[in-house]
Amino acid sequence: MANRAKSIIPAEVFPPGEFLRDELNARGWSQADFARIIVRPLQAVNEIINARKRMTVETAKAIGLALGTGPELWLNLEITYRLSTTPAPDPAIKKHVAERSAA
């Protein structure tokens, strides 16, 4: 049997608003409907859906309550997306940290 190297395929990372858009569509809710349900401005909901606004803890709590998911799901999606879109630390900083943490 041939020895095959297993390759790891990274999970797709997407903004939480993309998932929220799918949820609203599945429930037949407009963005305006949802904004009224979670008592947030329509503009804020639209900006989250279009990845122009970060999700706050308060908004994640409201969304989780409205959709029956809990805030953790939304905050995990948010932080995973933000980490994937943030540049890696400067190599000089990485070197400095490695030197300091080895001491």
Predicted feature descriptions by range:
Residues 26, 37, 66:
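Residues within the alpha-helical elements of helix-turn-helix
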Residues 2-29:
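A short, Lys/Arg-rich alpha-helix, primarily the initiator
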Residues 70-97:
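Short amphipathic recognition helices of helix-turn-helix/homeodomain-type DNA-binding modules
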